Amino acid sequence: MTESCDSGSLPLQDDVEKFLGGAARFNLYPDDDSVKYFEKKVIESFLDKVEAGIDVPNYPQFRDMSEMFLAMMEGVERVKGGYIEAKIPSVRADRNHIPELMVIKRNSQMIREKTGKPFQVKVCVTGPYTLSSFFIQRDNEIFDRLGNTISQIVENNIFSGKDGSAGLIAVDEPVFGMLDDPLIDYGSEGRENLRKAWEAIFHKVTSKNVQALLHLHNTADELFWEVKSLNIIDSHTDDPVYQMKKTKEQLEATDKFLKASICT
């Protein structure tokens, strides 16, 4: 079981535009100055987390966590007021890996030499429900379409080597449970499609012997308990799930763990 992991990163204090440019050019122009800057900041931040004693640090998250995954999708277009599906979303061939994770993977040997042992990294992706909230038009199958794409991104970014590996995959759903959304009303087709989308993503994770975590900001809607392949539930420190008596019973009944969240 994971001992400790973190969520996100402190804001980048240096040249944000150069960092974002490096992330965008990462696959096409490896010798570009902005790409080298991007790599340097990713490694520095990741090593800071390791040296702080975090067992499974998340890759540095200095970019918008929704836009970065929507940018990895073919068939998705940004328009005034949000996004639209020009065709069924799929993973772009030239952007099928998370640049931050590729930097860490390429520098695995150096990281291991500095830490003195093989390392694990937490891979955070934004979930289909939260991504759907950016679309102007939503139907009850949008969770399935976006979920298939995120599932492929997850599969592409799970790695394991002698120096380091992906030890935890976290699906971030900060919007879930925060809105009154008819698409996921109890008994609706959309609700079942969201459950299936989560199940498909987490099955990809657990089939690789990697732990699967769902990060929420509100657990009032208990759909997540029905996801069989989900190992770990995580929410904000003030979420009632941490104090409710029935939580322990549900954890035991569904064979899941609850991550203890700490604010520092």
What are these model-derived regions, one by one?
Residues 62-75, 119-135, 163-190:
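Active-site-proximal loop/short-helix segments
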Residues 78, 89-111, 189-209, 253-258:
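Alpha-helix-loop-beta-strand connector modules within alpha/beta enzyme cores
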Residues 62, 126-130, 174-176, 211-221, ...:
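Active-site beta-loop-alpha junctions enriched in small/polar residues
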